[in-house]
């Protein structure tokens, strides 16, 4: 199946800035999130495509590879790497060697071997709506590879240091001449590291990192929503042999609330009112995330009427603006009536039926429609 262009998926231009890409992702992820489109498989598939596109375009190295080679540059199944030639077996090294010579000015000496960057990690944190509204600082324990404190990440025994590999002169790769081709291969002596550790650290066994459980305090800003991520630079996996550490992404999810439903920064709720309050009007108390407020109900209010309370919703995670609280009133039908109450209601019903103009506009319109329906029917 043909893959869609990642820039097209995020609805941005190819020269879009990182901020524009992030803004587009947040908008589209919010629109197609499965929680907001229950049972909609097309929305779920769109959400997955948007996530994949953002994962590529938000990473500078992956974005550069995608800009140069398209999907083949970032999808291993289409070629096995940025060059897109991994699927050709042994010829992958041949073409890699050609590109190496082109982009290095024909020096033919390869790249200086350097440490490998640590992997990025993701940690999921679940918050209540109340916590998301005001922000929260949480302590998390992240299992990861951390830098070995004994050798300080070098992998060598304390007091010693790794030596440059004599076979590849620290390049991590060697060239082998086969006919007309000069093939570049991983150095068999240092296995691509460029250095030899003759006396490895006993604590990390020469890896420069060890398993640990790191406690980290995370400040989660007010206004976060499902799918938002907090990035902690350098708190991911430690790099190998001096490589930089990866990043930690704290993924936010919100617990379902008993009263409120969130739609972007607005909150929605249903408020039950009595038949008498709906007919005669009155005041009721409604809950907000900041406490109780009084809502005035005008006379002759119909069930389903929505009242908007300004700035009683969620704060914007960007630090400006606040959503509203939308209260939908539901007129309750009384139950478990006494004989006296039933008699009073019967009297009220008789009184209303004999009076004109007491039906709501919706009811009057419905009765008029039913009357016309029967008049037009031919039995």
Swiss-Prot record:
CXXCXGXG motif repeats lie at residues 148-155, 165-172, 187-194, 201-208. It is found in: Cytoplasm. A zinc finger (CR-type) spans 135-213. Zn(2+) 1 binds at residues 148, 151, 201, 204. Residues 5-70 form the J domain. It comes from the Bacteria. One of its GO terms (molecular function) is ATP binding. The keyword Zinc-finger applies. Zn(2+) 2 binds at residues 165, 168, 187, 190. One of its GO terms (biological process) is chaperone cofactor-dependent protein refolding. Keywords: Chaperone, Cytoplasm, DNA replication, Metal-binding, Repeat, Stress response, Zinc, Zinc-finger. Disulfide bonds: none annotated. The keyword Zinc applies. Its cofactor is Zn(2+). Its main location: cytoplasm. InterPro entries: DnaJ, DnaJ_C, DnaJ_domain, DnaJ_domain_CS, HSP40/DnaJ_pept-bd, HSP_DnaJ_Cys-rich_dom, HSP_DnaJ_Cys-rich_dom_sf, J_dom_sf. Binds 2 Zn(2+) ions per monomer. One of its GO terms (cellular component) is cytoplasm. The J domain is necessary and sufficient to stimulate DnaK ATPase activity. Zinc center 1 plays an important role in the autonomous, DnaK-independent chaperone activity of DnaJ. Zinc center 2 is essential for interaction with DnaK and for DnaJ activity. Belongs to the DnaJ family. Homodimer. Participates actively in the response to hyperosmotic and heat shock by preventing the aggregation of stress-denatured proteins and by disaggregating proteins, also in an autonomous, DnaK-independent fashion. Unfolded proteins bind initially to DnaJ; upon interaction with the DnaJ-bound protein, DnaK hydrolyzes its bound ATP, resulting in the formation of a stable complex. GrpE releases ADP from DnaK; ATP binding to DnaK triggers the release of the substrate protein, thus completing the reaction cycle. NCBIfam families: DnaJ_bact, PRK10767.1. This is Chaperone protein DnaJ. The lineage of its organism: Bacteria, Pseudomonadati, Pseudomonadota, Gammaproteobacteria, Legionellales. The gene is dnaJ.
